[in-house]
Amino acid sequence: QECGPASFPIVSLISFLVGLILAFVGALQLSLFGAQMYLADLVGLGMTREMGALMVGIIMAGRTGSSYAAQIGTMNVNNEIDALKTMGFHPMEFIVMPRMMALIIVMPLLCLYADFMGMLGGAAVAIGLFDISTTEYWVRTELAVSFKDILVGVFKASIFGILIAYSGCIRGM
């Protein structure tokens, strides 16, 4: 219930800053070759393929994975898991699966949001420091980023969600 919406502020900040830094460092290198117009391509592809999913994965591992481990560990100490077994409930189905499903659903959504925030950070640098127009930046981004690139990042985020939920729940048990 708290794994998704409560993560938006930190995902927003981190992704915006990653896009900002990616654009700034990339623009400095691209300007050596007179290729600043490819700045939107760099940020768009970098965020959608790799950085968006990676940043969300790191944030959610630290935030949600540790929360899952602590919650389930507390349940274990209080013998709540033994009580579930006694009542005939399988702890994996009752405790682990809902948490895993939550992260499988939330991670791709957070990844898409992180991609957008990173591109927004890149746009801030491109428009503010390197005299690239807003229209030119977003048109170049649209031309560079394909649906396949977005799907690659979303798929990675889903896999990260499974791994984070599984490792957090298993550590708690």
Model-derived segments and spans:
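Loop-to-helix entry region at the N-terminal start of transmembrane alpha-helices
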Residues: 2, 6, 10, 33-70, ...
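Hydrophobic alpha-helical transmembrane segments that constitute the membrane-spanning cores
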Residues: 14-21, 57, 61, 97-126, ...
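Short hydrophobic/aromatic-rich motifs at helix boundaries and adjacent loops
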Residues: 15-16, 51-55, 93, 139
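Membrane-interfacial helix-loop-helix connectors in multipass membrane proteins
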Residues: 21-48, 115-154, 158, 167-173
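Membrane-embedded alpha-helices of multi-pass transport/permease systems
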Residues: 62-72, 78, 121, 166-170
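Short cytoplasmic-facing helical segments at TM-TM junctions of multi-pass membrane proteins
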Residues: 71-97
